[in-house]
Amino acid sequence: MASISAASATATASTKLAYPYSPSSSSSSSNTAAVFPSNSSKLILSSSFTPTPSTLFLHSPTTTPSTTHPRRFTVRAARGKFERKKPHVNIGTIGHVDHGKTTLTAALTMALASMGNSAPKKYDEIDAAPEERARGITINTATVEYETENRHYAHVDCPGHADYVKNMITGAAQMDGAILVVSGADGPMPQTKEHILLAKQVGVPNMVVFLNKQDQVDDEELLELVELEVRELLSSYEFPGDEIPIISGSALLALEALMANPSIKRGENQWVDKIYQLMDNVDEYIPIPQRQTELPFLMAIEDVFSITGRGTVATGRVERGTVKVGEIVDIVGLKDTRNTTVTGVEMFQKILDEAMAGDNVGLLLRGIQKIDIQRGMVLAKPGTITPHTKFEALVYVLKKEEGGRHSPFFAGYRPQFYMRTTDVTGKVTVIMSDKGEESKMVMPGDRVNMVVELIMPVACEQGMRFAIREGGKTVGAGVIQKILE
């Protein structure tokens, strides 16, 4: 239990920067000075839910950096209503560490800003957490927004480092499509494969590939070989490798050109044109998802903030249905189910009358204390989902070559089960083969049915997917076949 709460505390801390909803300084205990040392980084946040900006001291969840640099981030209050003029798509960058995911994200916002379709974000604004500064790698999941001529995008810059695959699972679960970034100079690497596998597991339906660092590859044939290797790799994970668009370019040279001249138009710089070409392909290849707006409302909670005098804000992606101000919702999972009224809805610092499936929003909840609600719970239309601790699932256990276990496991095995934004320890009580015969042992590479008992109740339902993790790596993926308790 202690390890779970510690893990969720770390996860909560790690997502703070991605959301523009204000926590209140008074929500921490009165001995703030004792809890947060003076060298903690400081975050100034404000939103339309609160009249004055509040200050939050962010303390790094890891102790690796020997020093932390105090920095201020100011998030402006809501600037009016969010207008639904274009279809909305959730997208994200995935791929190996240092292949250029965050650089590409910055180049995308700068290029589309030059067309008047987004607010430009510099590299350090996206890559903005103490751990990232200390190790030069992206750890947190940052969300930016931009528009093409036809669509509005919410873009998640997914972490690439293997230690932070947990965030990747949460981030990838939010994607309608992905941009896989592969260095043309290095080709596919271990985390490239792990991210493609994770994308398959959590149901990312489509992806477009950006072969980065083209300027570092002298031989055109080498680039073609890397492209061929990427297509074969995608096909091996059951993506349509032969059809997926692959665009080569240099995110860094495009970003440098845009920093030097932010008003560059199409046709004026070959590297910036590659960025436009990438987004043309994303527009064409990644379909607008069919939103599940007709189904009952459900949103998995990713983060929680408290605002004195107003209530508590829960942030996350609306999985299905719609929710309006004034509607009653159930809070389900981990603790006893209770209900509350939604008193405010916000997306990207703008007020919404109604949130619908696919939106990343913050919901202000009446009469709920911050201690009553946590990451991993879900908000849902009353009576439409219930918490469970026991289910039967169809599970694929990864082979050693896929990064899975090297040895078999038996009934009584206790890994972590990742469902939506929840990670809960569970016990495998019964193992059955595909033919329905009880089995004693599961080998890496097996597809089996198993009965799982969770140590805490989680809002789950038939057809829901999950990942199985052990010792910092994914060892299996499954789908719930039947709820038992």
UniProtKB/Swiss-Prot annotation:
Residues 250-252 are annotated as: G5. Residues 212-215 are annotated as: G4. It is found in: Plastid, Chloroplast. GTP binds at residues 95-102, 157-161, 212-215. Residues 157-160 are annotated as: G3. This protein promotes the GTP-dependent binding of aminoacyl-tRNA to the A-site of ribosomes during protein biosynthesis. This is Elongation factor TuB, chloroplastic. The gene is TUFB.
